[in-house]
């Protein structure tokens, strides 16, 4: 047993460096350091069955290249462009907001009980004003059910107002609005409702995206416009319909808000009008703005192998091959004109790099793979081989042939000279034989090189496949170059990304003991938090800083047990399942398992996962930018002020609040209280329904007109009754006898005393008659008594006696 202080610890190192054999550049050092730090982050890796599925291609065979024609050259690969066309758009719309406010008896009783919001497109003549002066009219007209309704901001008059910028959350979206506050002032009369109107003009400058085949586009706020951004070029702009109309302005002016006086820009612009908004964008040339293909990779030295029906292209930099038909693409320069500038520039740069050893052998050729990728193939030929061919086609017996002539001229002259004698024919045959042997030797070398590359890749795939059976996680991590999680699903592997936890929240426990004295943890327990989370989770420290979401790694406790666990740049030393000390990782020697080959002229072929599209391209491939959409919408919705009360508060100011308060008072009465509450609630609901029905009847146009007529008739009737009452009080005799004044000339009035005697006698006579009627009414039995007596008499067989005499 070696003492602890002399214990030699060796940690396995999977370094891929080659020592002093291959110098490492600064870029490679930075890249290696980035990967190293990524490996030493605390992370949680799950083995979800919903991850990406992969399998190893074990059926790949290396094609037989015997007696095949091999050519070397420069290969450019272009892939389908999945990134949408991104361009600037400007959206215009007017928004009318109508709110209904209830003015309660107190200041706290003011509440908004309802809200309506409508948006409409802006007409073209007003868009011109908005783009030139950033002004608009604060009114709008909306046709609803065949009726044209006019809305004015603040319930006022039509005015020209200024648009001002609004702070946004993202720099890609800029808003200009005319009214930032919602008009929600209550009426002056208590207990009444009032409807307030707000009209807001809005301009939004943002980006839009359109994917191939460019038949529609989506704005950054989520608006979808079913118009091609290049509809002016391909004449696909739709005609005016009920849903969408398009206008093209050949000389439209759009000014910058900060430089409104000097930033005049007159450009061709397209306008699309929908029901809710209008949107415009600058008309551009489609061929100069978008391209269906995009550059992927270039290979300085590639090999083209000719088979019976296809061409095979391979290169040392990639573990994949390309297969195409022999027929090159027709009309490539016209169909893919957008690629020609990049192709010519790239080929010139590649040719310049090998200008000392190779020269172009013909023009560039264009092929298309079965997967839709475009291959640009520029054949190359070694300078020595070209010189040998030129010498072979040049006659040595023709002194007049200039050395600076072209190859075609020398070939023609050599043919003429060869026909002069058999000596030249023998000489030319010798040169041709030497050239054929040289070409065959070069082809054999290229053939062996191609087969070697292919076999090496097949063997590496088989090795990875067998290792994956032992530890798939390590295999996929090595292939991806970053920590991933895997799960074997039969013959395929499910790969998911690991989730980095909050690095500062990870706490490694100092004890490996459990509540059971005989059971101990085989890996240190840890507690941690996820990013943007406050909840603590428990787990165990796994290999290479992975956190396992379980505490099931246990073992029987052993006496004098000693373990070492590495986390980030530190090693934790446990003795008897208790933490003793923390050592730096650098203090522990490494066991380097990499065997360096000190041959600088041999290139290393690494197994790499071919990534056709980067993560950035896949992210941009979606025309919906959901992150920007939701962030901007939430920020804009929260920044609008003016709504001082919510709808929950409005429920406390209506008639139901009385029932709620009444039920709270009678809650302690038990079932009796429930009965009282139900009766009161039914009564209030009944009267509430009656009142609601009356109000709805009044709201109806016919009912409202009838109500106004009824109110007018009642007012007229009241006026007539008041006048009649006044006349009765002023001249009662004249009201009873209208013709009394006409008899003044023929009738002599009586003395006042006599008239008073007559009136007093009439009053006494009326009172005596009234008293007799009251006495008779009092002596008469009540209705209930009469009904009871009638029932009893009929029951005993009695009948009512007739009060009239019968005439016989």
Swiss-Prot record:
What domain of life? Viruses
Keyword list (alphabetical) reads: Disulfide bond, Glycoprotein, Host cell membrane, Host endosome, Host Golgi apparatus, Host membrane, Host-virus interaction, Membrane, Signal, Transmembrane, Transmembrane helix, Viral attachment to host cell, Viral envelope protein, Virion, Virus entry into host cell
Post-translational modification, as annotated: A proteolytic cleavage by host furin generates two subunits that remain linked by disulfide bonds.
Bilayer topology term? Single-pass type I membrane protein
Q: Which Pfam families match?
A: Glycoprot_B_PH1 (PF17416), Glycoprot_B_PH2 (PF17417), Glycoprotein_B (PF00606)
Which parts of this chain are annotated as the region Involved in fusion and/or binding to host membrane?
101-107, 187-195
Which parts of the sequence lie on the Virion surface side of the lipid bilayer? 20-701
Q: Which residues are glycosylated?
A: 30, 158, 239, 251, 285, 331, 344, 355, 361, 532, 569, 587, 598
Record's keyword annotation contains RNA-binding: no
Under InterPro entries, the record lists: Glycoprot_B_PH1 (IPR035377), Glycoprot_B_PH2 (IPR035381), Glycoprot_B_PH2_sf (IPR038631), Glycoprotein_B_ecto_C (IPR055341), Herpes_Glycoprot_B (IPR000234)
Q: Where is this region: Hydrophobic membrane proximal region?
A: 647-699, 658-698
* One of the protein's GO biological processes: virion attachment to host cell
Ranges facing Intravirion side:
723-808
Q: Which organism is it from?
A: Saimiriine herpesvirus 2 (strain 11) (SaHV-2)
Per the record, the gene is gB
Q: What family classification does the UniProt entry report for this protein?
A: Belongs to the herpesviridae glycoprotein B family.
Q: What is the role of the protein in this entry?
A: Envelope glycoprotein that forms spikes at the surface of virion envelope. Essential for the initial attachment to heparan sulfate moieties of the host cell surface proteoglycans. Involved in fusion of viral and cellular membranes leading to virus entry into the host cell. Following initial binding to its host receptors, membrane fusion is mediated by the fusion machinery composed at least of gB and the heterodimer gH/gL. May be involved in the fusion between the virion envelope and the outer nuclear membrane during virion egress.
Q: Which cysteines are joined by disulfide bonds?
A: 45-498, 62-454, 136-201, 291-338, 520-557
Subcellular location(s): the record lists: Virion membrane; Host cell membrane; Host endosome membrane; Host Golgi apparatus membrane
Its signal peptide is 1-19
**Subunit text:** Homotrimer; disulfide-linked. Binds to heparan sulfate proteoglycans. Interacts with gH/gL heterodimer.
- The name under which this protein is listed is Envelope glycoprotein B
List where the protein spans the membrane: 702-722
Give Gene Ontology CC terms. Answer: host cell endosome membrane; host cell Golgi membrane; host cell plasma membrane; membrane; viral envelope; virion membrane
Q: Where is this site: Cleavage?
A: 410-411
């Amino acid at each position: 047993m070696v003492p602890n202080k002399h214990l030699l610890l060796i940690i396995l190192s999977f370094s891929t460096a080659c020592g002093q054999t291959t110098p490492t550049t600064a870029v490679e050092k930075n890249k290696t350091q980035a990967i190293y730090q990524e490996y030493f982050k605390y992370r949680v890796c799950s083995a979800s069955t919903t991850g990406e599925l992969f399998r190893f291609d074990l059926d790949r065979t290396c094609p037989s290249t015997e007696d095949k024609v091999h050519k070397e050259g420069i290969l450019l690969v272009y892939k389908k462009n999945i990134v949408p066309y991104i361009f600037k758009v400007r959206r215009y719309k007017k928004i009318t907001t109508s709110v209904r406010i209830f003015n309660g008896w107190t200041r706290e009783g003011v509440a908004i009980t309802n809200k309506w919001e409508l948006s409409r497109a802006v007409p073209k003549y007003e868009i011109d004003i908005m783009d030139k002066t950033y002004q608009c009219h604060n009114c709008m007209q909306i046709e609803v059910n065949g009726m044209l309704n006019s809305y004015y901001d603040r319930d006022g008059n039509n005015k020209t107002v200024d648009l001002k910028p609004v702070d946004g959350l993202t720099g890609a979206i800029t808003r200009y609005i005319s009214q930032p506050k919602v008009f929600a002032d209550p009426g002056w009369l208590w207990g009444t409702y009032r409807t307030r109107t707000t009209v807001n003009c809005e301009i939004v400058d943002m980006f839009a995206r359109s994917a191939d085949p460019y038949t529609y586009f989506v704005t950054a706020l989520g608006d979808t416009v079913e118009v091609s951004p290049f509809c002016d070029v391909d004449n696909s702009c739709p005609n005016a319909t009920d849903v969408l109309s398009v206008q093209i302005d050949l000389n439209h002016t759009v000014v910058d808000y900060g430089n409104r006086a000097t930033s005049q820009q007159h450009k061709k612009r397209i306008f699309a009008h929908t029901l809710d908004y209008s949107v415009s964008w600058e008309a551009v040339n489609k061929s100069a703005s978008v391209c269906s293909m995009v550059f992927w990779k270039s290979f300085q030295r590639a090999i083209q192998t000719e088979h019976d029906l296809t061409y095979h292209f391979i290169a040392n930099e990639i573990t994949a091959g390309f297969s195409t038909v022999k027929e090159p693409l027709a009309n490539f320069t016209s169909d893919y004109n957008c690629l020609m500038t990049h192709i010519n520039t790239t080929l010139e740069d590649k040719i310049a790099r090998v200008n000392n050893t190779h020269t172009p052998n013909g023009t560039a050729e264009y092929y298309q793979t079965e997967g839709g990728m475009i291959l640009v193939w520029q054949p190359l030929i070694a300078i020595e081989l070209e010189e040998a061919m030129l010498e072979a086609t040049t006659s040595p017996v023709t002194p007049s042939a200039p050395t600076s002539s072209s190859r075609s001229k020398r070939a023609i002259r050599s043919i003429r000279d060869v026909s002069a004698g058999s000596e030249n024919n023998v000489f030319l045959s010798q040169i041709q034989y030497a050239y054929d042997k040289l070409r065959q030797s070069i082809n054999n070398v290229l053939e062996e090189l191609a087969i070697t590359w292919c076999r090496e890749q097949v063997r590496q795939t088989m090795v990875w496949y067998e290792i994956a059976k032992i530890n798939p996680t390590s295999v996929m991590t090595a292939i991806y170059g970053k920590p991933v999680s895997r799960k074997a699903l039969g013959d395929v592997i499910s790969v998911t990304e690991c989730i980095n936890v909050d690095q500062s929240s990870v706490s490694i426990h100092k004890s490996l003991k459990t509540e059971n004295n005989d059971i101990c943890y085989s890996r240190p327990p840890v507690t941690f938090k996820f990013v943007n989370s406050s909840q603590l989770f428990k787990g165990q420290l796994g290999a290479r800083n992975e956190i396992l979401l379980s505490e099931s790694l246990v073992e029987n406790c052993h006496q004098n047990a000693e373990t070492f666990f590495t986390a980030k740049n530190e090693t934790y030393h446990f003795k008897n399942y208790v933490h003793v000390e923390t050592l730096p990782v650098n203090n522990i020697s490494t066991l380097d398992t990499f065997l360096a080959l000190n041959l600088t002229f041999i290139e290393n072929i690494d197994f790499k996962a071919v990534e056709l599209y980067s993560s950035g391209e896949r992210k941009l491939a979606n025309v919906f930018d959901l992150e920007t959409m939701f962030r901007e919408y939430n920020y804009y919705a929260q920044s609008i002020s003016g709504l001082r009360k919510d709808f929950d508060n409005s429920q406390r100011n209506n008639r139901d609040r009385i029932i709620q308060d009444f039920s709270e008072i009678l809650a302690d009465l038990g079932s009796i209280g429930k009965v009282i509450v139900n009766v009161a609630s039914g009564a209030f609901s009944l009267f509430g329904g009656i009142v609601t029905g009356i109000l709805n009847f009044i709201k109806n146009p016919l009912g409202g007109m009838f109500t106004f007529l009824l109110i007018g008739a009642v007012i007229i009737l009241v006026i007539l009754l008041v006048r009649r009452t006044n006349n009765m009080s002023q001249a009662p005799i004249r009201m009873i006898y209208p013709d009394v004044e006409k008899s003044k000339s023929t009738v002599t009035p009586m003395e006042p005393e006599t008239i008073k005697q007559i009136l007093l006698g009439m009053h006494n006579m009326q009172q005596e008659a009234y008293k007799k009627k009251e006495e008779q009414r009092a002596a008469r039995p009540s209705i209930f008594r009469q009904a009871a007596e009638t029932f009893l008499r009929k029951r005993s067989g009695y009948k009512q006696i007739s009060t009239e005499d019968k005439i016989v």
